[in-house]
């Protein structure tokens, strides 16, 4: 049965995800301001182009985090802890391209955290179907962000930034096919396991 709390969770998680994505992107732009200034596609971004000062960017990031935090405090204890723990992934992601060829994995871990958070906010705990769905989201992120990274691969090579696009090179197609395959398999597993659980609950 759908209740008012379900609508609140759907609405608030959507707003919270929007705010935290904005905060994460701002944090990424703050740390990458010198890199962005050296890349053709990104040198016109607000910070490297001088449209926004570093102080303004930091204040804007903190405002977004504060608003998302207020939403998080309306949830149960487990989801508050889960939400706070996501900050580690948000903080570390911009550094990932500096020490690993797989920064897209860190992006996937961070971007799809909301799947876990919404479920825990609704039920109070995790289960295997939702964990499978979370990993499906990670593979989906690996798929699309690897494609996205190819447009900067030449500049990234020059300045020493790592990515799966550079790592895969001419072998990208088989990797991308693998990612999308794993994504669909994990989504199917999630649906199947949950349907089996639901059937057993009705018996």
PLM feature segments, named:
Residues 2-9, 80-86, 90, 104-159, ...:
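Functional transmembrane core segments of multi-pass inner-membrane proteins
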Residues 7-17, 33-83, 158-196:
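Multi-pass membrane catalytic core of lipid/isoprenoid biosynthesis enzymes
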Residues 15, 23, 42-132:
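Intramembrane alpha-helical segments
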Residues 24-28, 36, 40, 144, ...:
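Alpha-helical transmembrane segments and their lipid-water interface positions
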Residues 30, 34, 150, 154, ...:
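Calcium-binding loop positions in Ca2+-binding modules
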Residues 197-203:
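Conserved small/polar residues in nucleotide/adenosyl-binding loops
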């Amino acid at each position: 049965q759908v209740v008012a709390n379900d609508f609140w969770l759907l609405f608030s998680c959507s707003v919270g995800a929007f705010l935290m994505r904005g905060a994460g992107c701002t944090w990424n732009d703050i740390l990458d301001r010198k890199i962005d200034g050296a890349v053709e596609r990104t040198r016109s971004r607000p910070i490297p182009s001088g449209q926004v000062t570093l102080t303004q960017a930091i204040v804007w990031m903190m405002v977004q985090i504060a608003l998302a935090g207020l939403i998080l405090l309306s949830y149960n204890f487990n989801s508050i802890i889960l939400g706070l723990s996501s900050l580690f992934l948000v903080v570390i992601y911009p550094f990932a391209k500096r020490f690993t060829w797989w920064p897209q994995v860190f992006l996937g871990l961070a971007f799809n955290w909301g799947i876990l958070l919404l479920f825990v906010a609704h039920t109070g705990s995790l289960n295997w179907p939702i964990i499978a769905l979370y990993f499906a989201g990670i593979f989906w992120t690996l798929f699309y962000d690897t494609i996205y990274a190819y447009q900067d691969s030449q500049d990234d090579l020059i300045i020493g930034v790592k990515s799966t696009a550079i790592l895969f090179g001419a072998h990208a197609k088989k990797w991308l096919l693998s990612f999308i395959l794993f994504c669909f398999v994990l989504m199917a597993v999630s649906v199947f396991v949950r349907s089996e659980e639901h059937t057993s609950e009705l018996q």
